[in-house]
Amino acid sequence: MRASFFWFLPLLLILASVAQGQPRPKPGIRRKPKPRPTPSFPQPHEPAEPTDLPPPLPPGPPSVFPDCPRECYCPPDFPSALYCDSRNLRKVPIIPPRIHYLYLQNNFITELPVESFKNATGLRWINLDNNRIRKVDQRVLEKLPGLAFLYMDKNQLEEVPSALPRNLEQLRLSQNLISRIPPGVFSKLENLLLLDLQHNRLSDGVFKADTFQGLKNLMQLNLAHNILRRMPPKVPPAIHQLYLDSNKIETIPSGYFKDFPNLAFIRMNYNKLSDRGLPKNSFNISNLLVLHLSHNKISNVPAISNKLEHLYLNNNSIEKINGTQICPSNLVAFHDFSSDLENVPHLRYLRLDGNFLKPPIPLDLMMCFRLLQSVVI
């Protein structure tokens, strides 16, 4: 027994020495937990700063006119005109006194400095379309008594400019951000013939009973593509053309058009007009020549006058049409074509497609409107 113990003893010593030579296992490294990523949300797109704009075009060759701004063009054969359009301008140059026609469209102009116009008192025409103008200093317009044409389409105006010159004949302010019309802004514009306010943010509350007061000779009024629900009040009686497309108008007050003896053209496409909102004889106007009522909710063809030549009723809810009922003249016998053309309905073009009608065209319709050249169903 003792002999066997001594035999195992060397073996145990060898195993102990091998175990002592092995490296001890290192303690595990404790890593810090990674922070959870915070959710990211898309940031709103910021408008481009002026530094992002393309650089102005290099100045052209010297002009024959010493006072011609280098960034513009002064045509030798048209000394009263100054062309500064489409040149990536940020500022309006100094306008020479000899200039009557000023072209500044398609630039990046944000304001109209008084200094630029102080000597240009003879201006008659200014085109500022497609710029970035937010407001017009009334001191600029006050010093332009002869200005007749002011074009400021495609800018960032929020209200109609004040202190408009008395001799203004055309004022174009479409495709802006206009939601306000200052009181009395049109009161002295007796010579204004055209007022274009389409594609703005005009609502019913903007138009008061005296908004158009003073526009005694206005011939064309364009209020299309706004947010009107009612017909504008007190439209000047001299009006010839009225544009109200793409609003939300549902009703036309009874007798609304009776005070417009010269009204020849009405556009009211893309509204919410229905039979309920159209009193009888709403459009039976003596001098009306063209009537657009497409894309509404009309179920019956409205009464029209003898003189109407073009009628657009496409894309409505019309299911049937009775030529005898809509005929503006009481013709005793359809087969007897009267030689008095004044009493024959003048309708030449009738559009009815996009309704619930099917060919053929009713015979009584053709018998009434003998001058019809085109009918679209």
Swiss-Prot record:
GO terms for molecular function: heparin binding. Residues 1-21 form the signal peptide. Disulfide bonds join 327-368. Glycosylated; contains heparan sulfate. Residues 36-45, 52-61 have a biased composition (Pro residues). InterPro entries: Leu-rich_rpt, Leu-rich_rpt_typical-subtyp, LRR_dom_sf, LRRNT, SLRP. Keywords: Disulfide bond, Extracellular matrix, Glycoprotein, Heparan sulfate, Heparin-binding, Leucine-rich repeat, Proteoglycan, Repeat, Secreted, Signal. LRR repeats lie at residues 90-109, 110-133, 134-157, 158-178, 179-202, 203-228, 229-249, 250-273, 274-298, 299-318, 319-357, 358-377. Glycans are attached at residues 119, 284, 315, 322. Residues 22-61 are annotated as: Disordered. GO terms for cellular component: extracellular space. Its main location: secreted. It is found in: Secreted, Extracellular space, Extracellular matrix. GO terms for biological process: cellular senescence. May anchor basement membranes to the underlying connective tissue. Binds the basement membrane heparan sulfate proteoglycan perlecan and triple helical collagens type I and type II. Belongs to the small leucine-rich proteoglycan (SLRP) family. SLRP class II subfamily. The basic N-terminal Arg/Pro-rich region binds heparin and heparan sulfate. Binds collagens type I and type II through its leucine-rich repeat domain. This is Prolargin. The lineage of its organism: Eukaryota, Metazoa, Chordata, Craniata, Vertebrata.
